[in-house]
């Protein structure tokens, strides 16, 4: 419809007015492009093509281009107006991928500003259309029933606790034994389950030979194509959710659905990413079932019960609400969008995730802390910090044709209100997580791009080395040949990868050393891709002589993972401290067990008998001097006073910190008297020692003042809270360094001076420690430390009185100028509490007559009026 629109101009340069169709996965982009090219009777790459990462099948004449979301975002960096694109179609939008939400928001922004002619289409078979239509300004909603065949849904009668691969293998066997024709598509959550399912089917001795084909995103294109190619045998395709949407596999009439998927989630509070095995939503289950009805009536076998189906979530959680947002926030900063929480999203991201991403980017040095007016106000500086003085410079943002609404005109030109640093602009050119791009930017400076690219490839996928059990001692001993350096666990991985490559990724040879041959092959592919990217977008510059050689790669790893800097607590432990008050334990298999400082590329949480443990892996030893040279603005030195709990004294120490993590300390010969006093006071507030002289009288004075402040708010009295007491003690302890000195200090006088004698005299009037009582006696009051009760009403002070002695009392005692009654606890002659009252006359008239008979009987020696 869009391609053949008569209003669409045709007399234009090749490539102008293209239609771009976004697909959530590379497999889908390739497969759908091939299908559409076949339907349009044109070679793939001519009128219809696709472009995915490292694979471009387009030409100047391509009018329909299928791409993944990352490609469109890359185009937006290079050409923020998308000047050669007429329409952007978001296919399978119900999956709510992170980059699809970003791309839609940016496309909408572009349409509302400089490209009102840009057409935006959002498509899905299961999407709830109304919210999206409203987000796009109330756009029309078109419904097409399409051509689909009926699909019978079959659930389990009872839950099955067996491994999901075993259940799937049994379901395949039933289909084959029943003689039901048609290809079989099995959905599994990951590669391990795919291999287990194929193994179960091979072991089942099926009565019919099947073409068993795995399908997942890590396979090379030629192996993925086997799932779509004709076969003389019935096909059994075992796939991840790459086959859930977009692609049609001709001949599939049976779907076996595990109902599971691996979902990436990000814990913004702890900064940990996890890959969790979770039940899919009902919408995803419907999509999977639909694969059985594309070319003929089919059957979907769900490996869960019908009642269990109703308990599943209706739709997927948008990825933007559960993902690490660092890469997206970097992109938005490049477009002049400094606050992602105020951007016009379809669904708002978690503010805590945005804040975590911002902090990471600032830590990596991608965002300027403070941008001088000369850098962004008039746009006269390049990303490398040099001035633009040539008025004919084609990248000059002050060119009259440039826009001034916060968008980029050139991929390397800073924009008004953009606060990316020169490092940030370089990172932006590398489509990968900012940790890896920062590592490669540093590698370009130090002259070790290939080694850094290999490290990025090793850490960006699954584990290369198998986790060893108790029975794998022979593998552990054989693997020792990889551990030739105690500088970095990456060196171990690099040697293991080199071994796999030298053995031509032979599965049996790799298995003997606990190396995953298939993963090593994927590392090789990723390494080549990253190397190609880095070679295109980064210029390797010769390193300074002192930083060449053995230090170069560890420095790069430090640059990329500096926010995960760890300090060993002492030489005899694996326990470590990290920034932001975090802690963890170095993995026992790490070779970096002697390093006092290291960065951890892997942080994961495991369960133990003592509770959750944060495990620090893929460690690289670093030096304090490297941190100071690479991140000078984040390293501080200050003399601080610390309390030594062992020796019960205060010491002055010079602390060198990266952010809040102590890197080094040096004891100082002298202490500052006031600082030492404050340190002792803070130690007391943390219950590190006791103060016998901080007695009941002082505590009661604090409680009296706080209660008066609560009852008489118009006086605006400052409360005596924990902070005030710490301040008072700090003054009292000035010049002291030992606990025994603090315990001998005259605290009562210090407390009186702190509060002021005038205030204490006033306090004795409105909230006295004791009140006149029945003549010359004084009645002591006990003031509560909590000034208000559960209903936020002021808590009255209390006093114990003997019931038989107060019949002469005419008026109930009150404090705070009559605003608050005293709570009288009426006691028996032996002192036992009977009742409490806030109104003695009312109690005497209404309640006492009911108590009197029992009191007369129990205490006959006393007079009961």
Residue ranges of model-derived segments:
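P-loop NTPase motor module signature
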Residues: 1-370, 417-439, 446, 585, ...
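Long, charged, glycine-rich C-terminal linkers/tails
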Residues: 46-52, 215, 557, 574, ...
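Extended active-site and interfacial segments that coordinate phosphate-rich ligands
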Residues: 79-94, 258-266, 271, 275, ...
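Second RecA-like catalytic domain
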Residues: 209, 214, 256, 264, ...
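Extended, non-globular interaction scaffolds
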Residues: 218, 392-398
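Intrinsic, low-complexity polybasic segments
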Residues: 370-384
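A positional "C-terminalness" feature that preferentially activates on distal terminal regions of long
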Residues: 533-570, 589, 632, 642-865
């Amino acid at each position: 419809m869009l391609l053949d629109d008569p209003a669409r101009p045709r007399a234009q340069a090749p490539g102008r007015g293209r239609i771009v169709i976004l697909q959530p996965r590379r497999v889908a982009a390739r497969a759908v492009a091939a299908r559409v090219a076949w339907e349009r009777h044109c070679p793939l790459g001519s009128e219809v093509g696709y472009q995915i990462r490292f694979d471009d099948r387009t030409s100047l004449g391509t009018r329909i281009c299928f791409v993944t979301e990352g490609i469109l975002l890359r185009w937006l960096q290079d050409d923020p107006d998308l000047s050669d694109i007429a329409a952007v179609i978001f296919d399978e939008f119900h999956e709510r991928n992170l980059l699809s939400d970003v791309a839609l928001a940016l496309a909408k922004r572009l349409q509302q500003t400089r490209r009102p002619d840009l057409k935006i289409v959002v498509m899905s078979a299961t999407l709830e259309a109304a919210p999206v239509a409203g987000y796009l300004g109330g756009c029309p909603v078109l419904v097409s029933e399409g051509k689909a065949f009926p699909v019978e849904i079959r659930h389990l009668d009872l839950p099955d606790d067996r491994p999901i691969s075993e259940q799937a293998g049994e379901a395949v066997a039933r289909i084959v034994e029943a003689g039901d024709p048609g290809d079989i598509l099995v959905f599994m959550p990951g590669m391990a389950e795919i291999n287990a399912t194929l193994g179960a089917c091979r072991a089942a001795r099926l009565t019919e030979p099947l073409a068993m084909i795995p399908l997942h995103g890590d396979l090379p294109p030629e192996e993925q194509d086997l799932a779509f190619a004709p076969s003389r045998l019935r096909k059994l395709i075992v796939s991840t959710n790459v086959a859930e949407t977009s692609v049609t596999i001709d001949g599939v009439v049976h779907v076996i659905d595990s109902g599971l998927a691996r979902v990436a989630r990000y814990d913004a509070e702890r900064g940990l990413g996890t890959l969790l095995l979770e039940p899919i939503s009902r919408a995803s289950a419907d999509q999977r079932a639909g694969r059985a009805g594309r070319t003929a009536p089919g059957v979907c076998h769900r490996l869960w019960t019908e009642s269990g189906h109703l308990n599943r979530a209706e739709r997927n959680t948008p990825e933007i609400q559960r993902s690490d947002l660092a890469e997206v926030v970097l992109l938005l900063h490049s477009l002049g969008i400094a606050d992602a929480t105020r951007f016009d999203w379809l669904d708002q991201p978690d503010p805590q995730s945005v804040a975590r991403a911002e902090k990471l980017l600032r830590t990596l040095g991608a965002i300027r802390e403070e941008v001088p007016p000369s850098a962004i106000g008039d746009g006269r500086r390049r990303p490398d910090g040099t001035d633009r003085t040539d008025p004919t410079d084609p990248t000059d943002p002050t060119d009259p044709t440039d826009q001034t609404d916060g968008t980029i005109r050139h991929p390397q030109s800073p924009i008004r209100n953009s606060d990316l640093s020169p490092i940030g602009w370089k990172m932006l050119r590398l489509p990968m997580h900012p940790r890896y791009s920062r590592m490669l930017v540093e590698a370009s400076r130090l002259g070790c791009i290939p080694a850094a690219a290999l490290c990025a490839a090793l850490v960006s996928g699954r584990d290369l080395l198998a986790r060893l059990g108790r029975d794998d001692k022979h593998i552990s001993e054989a693997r020792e040949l990889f551990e030739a350096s105690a500088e970095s666990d990456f060196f171990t991985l690099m040697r293991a990868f080199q071994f796999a490559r030298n053995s031509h990724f032979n599965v049996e040879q790799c298995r003997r050393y606990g190396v995953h041959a298939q993963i090593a092959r994927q590392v090789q592919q990723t390494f080549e891709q990253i190397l190609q990217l880095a070679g295109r977008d980064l210029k390797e510059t010769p390193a300074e002589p002192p930083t060449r050689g053995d230090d170069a790669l560890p420095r790069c790893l430090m640059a990329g993972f500096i926010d995960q800097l760890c300090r060993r607590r002492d030489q005899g432990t694996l326990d470590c401290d990290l920034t932001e008050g975090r802690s963890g334990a170095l993995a026992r298999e790490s070779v970096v067990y002697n390093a006092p400082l290291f960065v951890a590329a892997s942080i994961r949480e495991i369960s133990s008998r003592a509770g959750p443990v944060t495990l620090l892996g893929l460690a690289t030893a670093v030096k304090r001097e490297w941190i100071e040279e690479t991140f000078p603005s984040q390293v501080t030195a200050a003399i601080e006073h610390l309390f030594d709990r062992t020796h019960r004294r205060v010491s002055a120490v010079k602390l060198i910190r990266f952010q809040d993590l102590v890197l080094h300390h040096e004891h100082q010969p002298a202490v500052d008297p006031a600082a030492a006093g404050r340190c002792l006071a803070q130690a007391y507030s943390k219950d590190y020692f006791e103060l016998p002289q901080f007695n009941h009288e002082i505590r009661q004075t604090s409680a009296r003042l706080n209660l008066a402040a609560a009852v008489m708010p118009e006086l605006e009295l400052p409360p005596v809270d924990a902070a005030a007491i710490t301040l008072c003690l700090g003054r009292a302890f000035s010049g002291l360094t030992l606990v025994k000195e603090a315990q001998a200090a005259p605290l009562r006088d210090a407390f009186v001076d702190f509060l002021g004698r005038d205030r204490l005299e006033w306090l004795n009037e409105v909230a006295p420690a004791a009140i006149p009582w029945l003549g010359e006696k004084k009645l002591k009051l006990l003031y509560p430390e909590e000034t208000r009760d559960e209903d936020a009403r002021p808590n009255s002070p209390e006093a114990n009185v003997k019931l038989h002695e107060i019949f002469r009392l005419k008026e109930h005692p009150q404090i705070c100028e009559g605003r608050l009654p005293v709570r009288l606890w009426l006691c028996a002659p032996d002192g036992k509490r009977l009742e409490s009252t806030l109104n003695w006359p009312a109690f005497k008239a209404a309640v006492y007559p009911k108590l009197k008979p029992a009191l007369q009987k129990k205490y006959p020696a006393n007079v009961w009026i």
